[in-house]
Amino acid sequence: LECKEKIPDAAKRTIEHFGIDAGFKFIVHETYPPHSGFGSGTQIAVSTAHLITETMGIEIESRELSTIVGRGGTSGIGTYTHDLGGFILDGGHSKEEKPLFLPSGASKAKPATLIARYEFPEDWNILIAIPEIEVHVEGDDEVDVFQTYCPIPKEEVEQVSHLILMNLVPFMLEKDIKNFGWAVSELQKVGFNKLEHSLDPHYLPTMQALDDAGAYGTGISSFGPTLYTVFDDDNKDIVKAAEEIVGKDKVKVTKAQNHGYVIEK
């Protein structure tokens, strides 16, 4: 359903922006759950625009395409991972660029500026769990959250920045998986993540159960419901535990992708 909505919308925006006099047919072979914290909306929209511009021989950066199709107004993560893959850190927006706190789909701002991009350890296993949650925060509800609870207190923003720059990133570069997981857990206790958990505490028991089962640290992606953790051979039993907690069909083990989009001709 998300593809049926977002592909025509992104195609229409792209065609109108460039004045293209042509029609396009899109065939989607596989996708992943919408509104689940995967950033699928941005990937679908930017990929649609990219296929059109590539076909028409138009050279343009994905950051510009994101703006054209109305994505990336909150975070640049989806745009930069589309191009580069890996671990992305962006710097937010200036008040001139984005005077109001709004989610990506409701903001006309360009994707935030890229601060850093690193290779994510490809030997680390990534566990993704999608618990059954009836309520997804999206659309007008998401806008209401941003307008009601933002800005996040400066002290908490400073805490988040310290955890990322002085803990999460260094531990990742040092391939210290256990302390990287610890940093992920600490990030759940401050800033926007803390707000998310206070507004919807349904995820907390599942996250605690995963941690109790041996996860090095469990995080929530965007507004959820997707939860994630990293693991190695020392705690690989976390996979079986996760399947027992949320259901075997709700768990996926994967690796990092340290490259961007691929166009096959």
Task: Give names to the regions the model predicted.
Residues F26-V28, A129-P131, L227:
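A structural signal for short, well-ordered beta-strand segments
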Residues S47:
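Active-site signature of alpha/beta-hydrolase-fold catalytic machinery across serine-
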Residues L1-S40, H50-R63, T67, G73, ...:
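ATP-binding N-lobe of GHMP and related small-molecule kinases
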Residues Y203, I220-Y228:
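Small/polar glycine-rich anion-binding or flexible loop at a beta-alpha turn
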Residues G19-I20, D211-D212, G219-F223:
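A structural signal for short secondary-structure junctions
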Residues E61-Y216, D232-K265:
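ATP-dependent small-molecule kinase catalytic core of the GHMP/sugar-kinase superfamily
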Residues F24-V28, T218, V251:
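Generic structural signal for residues in well-ordered beta-strands
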